[in-house]
């Protein structure tokens, strides 16, 4: 017979005391592992990260932070800077460049996106608490003193407000304040375009206090004060980012001496766009103008049309090239190249005009017949052909009646710049160059390409290496 305090089931005997102990153990396990008794909702699984690192932090009562802020702001005057009347307020600045670009050469400005940070000490914001730092949102910015920093060379500046104002405020228990904000600035950059498009520029970003001179506020750079992001995402297009440097200077004005902080971004222009759009087309047009030297001189419409077409094309190219530049009063490197190309093209047209003029104005055959019928009382002592020794080479100069024209004293001339077949023997023509009109195209075929190649050699060496 079993005891009244025990009961049995089959062959197992259970005691009420044992049952109570088991119940307590089960409740304890369930309290330690609530996941066994509660089912996670879909929202819980969405926020759950399997690789999340859990950090234990001391729990700060919300009421304590509120009390600290109320105590700090009680009697606080945000119109007065820290240590007013005692010493200047030292502000440490640093900057993170998110992106630069594009650069607008016509308006001489560039766009930059930065995170700008300022740090200073305000003894009025010291507090005693286990909390070392108060991480506050932008609502607290207007309740404490903030430096009146402005960007001196900005044409336009925008703060980011989506989805909330991109501003951050931190207050440490020793009175240190950190204030950061994100800005997009269109800053002025005076471009010197003498070497365009092989130019390099240093575009500044300058900031200082608007109303406090250096007796009131002093700016100072932090270590590693300017950092840059991934330059591959920058929209510089025609430029390459070379580097940066930061400086500090004092600017004297009628209202006082101000500490001005500057960051210079060094940019180098890429020539690819202008090589394709300007340099190669201009070179090809110049070479095309030389084709007229191989066309028969009697083909007046063909040579004239080619010359005029190349001149008009060069005029169009020079106009298009100027559209990407501001209206500066000096000559740029590209202006020089385009102008010289225009001169070569125009000279090719003038060359044919000169050749055609002297050839077409030769003496008519009827006049020659009249001269033969009524010969003048003169003695012809000119030889039909003459052998001239020049530069150790023998040249046979023959009179070419086809290209003769009326010259001094009614004499027929077969050469340009000379009125006798043997120009070297004429004392009044001593030192003159003997050029045959019929060979002007032959001379041009050599002179024009040689001169253009020499110009390119001097041009590219001067602008790229000197």
Swiss-Prot record:
Described function: Gamma subunit of the heteropentameric ligand-gated chloride channel gated by gamma-aminobutyric acid (GABA), a major inhibitory neurotransmitter in the brain. GABA-gated chloride channels, also named GABA(A) receptors (GABAAR), consist of five subunits arranged around a central pore and contain GABA active binding site(s) located at the alpha and beta subunit interface(s). When activated by GABA, GABAARs selectively allow the flow of chloride anions across the cell membrane down their electrochemical gradient.
Disulfide bond entries: 189-203
GO cellular component: axon; cell surface; chloride channel complex; cytoplasmic vesicle membrane; dendrite membrane; GABA receptor complex; GABA-A receptor complex; GABA-ergic synapse
Signal peptide: 1-38
GO terms, biological process: adult behavior; cellular response to histamine; cellular response to zinc ion; chemical synaptic transmission; chloride transmembrane transport; chloride transport; gamma-aminobutyric acid signaling pathway; inhibitory synapse assembly
Coiled coil: none
Protein name: Gamma-aminobutyric acid receptor subunit gamma-2
């Amino acid at each position: 017979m079993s005891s009244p305090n025990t009961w049995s089931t089959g062959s197992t005997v259970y005691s009420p005391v044992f049952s109570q102990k088991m119940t307590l153990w089960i409740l304890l396990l369930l309290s330690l592992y609530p996941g066994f008794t509660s089912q996670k909702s879909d929202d819980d699984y969405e926020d759950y990260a399997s690789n999340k690192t859990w950090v234990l932090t001391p729990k700060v009562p919300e009421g304590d932070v509120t009390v600290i802020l109320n105590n700090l702001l009680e009697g606080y005057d945000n119109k007065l800077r820290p240590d007013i009347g005692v010493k200047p307020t030292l502000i440490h600045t640093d900057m993170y460049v998110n992106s630069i670009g594009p650069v607008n050469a016509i308006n001489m400005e560039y766009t930059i996106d930065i995170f700008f940070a300022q740090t200073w000490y305000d003894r009025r914001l010291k507090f005693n608490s286990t909390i070392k730092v108060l991480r506050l949102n932008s609502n607290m910015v207007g309740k404490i003193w903030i430096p009146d920093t402005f960007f001196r060379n900005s044409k336009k500046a925008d703060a980011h407000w989506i989805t909330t104002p991109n501003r951050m405020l931190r207050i440490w228990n020793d009175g240190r304040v950190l204030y950061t904000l994100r800005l997009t600035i269109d800053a002025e950059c005076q471009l010197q375009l003498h070497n365009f498009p092989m130019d390099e520029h240093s575009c500044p970003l300058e900031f200082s206090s608007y109303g406090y001179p250096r007796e009131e506020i002093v700016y100072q750079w932090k270590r590693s004060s300017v950092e840059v992001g991934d330059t591959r995402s920058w929209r510089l297009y025609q430029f390459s980012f070379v580097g940066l440097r930061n400086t500090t200077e004092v600017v004297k004005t009628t209202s006082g001496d101000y500490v001005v902080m500057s960051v210079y971004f060094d940019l180098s222009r890429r020539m690819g766009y202008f090589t394709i759009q300007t340099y190669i087309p201009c070179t090809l047009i110049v070479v095309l103008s030389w084709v007229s030297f191989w066309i028969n001189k009697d083909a007046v419409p063909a040579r004239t049309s080619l010359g005029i077409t190349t001149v008009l094309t060069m005029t169009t190219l020079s106009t298009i090239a100027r559209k990407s530049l501001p209206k500066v009063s000096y000559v740029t490197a590209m202006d020089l190249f385009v102008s010289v190309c225009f001169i070569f093209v125009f000279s090719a047209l003038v060359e044919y005009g000169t050749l055609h003029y002297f050839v077409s104005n030769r003496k008519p055959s009827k006049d020659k017949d009249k001269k033969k019928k009524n010969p003048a009382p003169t003695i012809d002592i000119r030889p039909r052909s003459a052998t001239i020794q020049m530069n150790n080479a023998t040249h046979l100069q023959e009179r070419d009646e086809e290209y003769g024209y009326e010259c001094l004293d009614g004499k027929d001339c077969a050469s340009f710049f000379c009125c006798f077949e043997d120009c070297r023997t004429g004392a009044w023509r001593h030192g003159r160059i003997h050029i045959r009109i019929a060979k002007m195209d032959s001379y041009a075929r050599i002179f024009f390409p040689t001169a253009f190649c020499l110009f390119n050699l001097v041009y590219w060496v001067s602008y790229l290496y000197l």
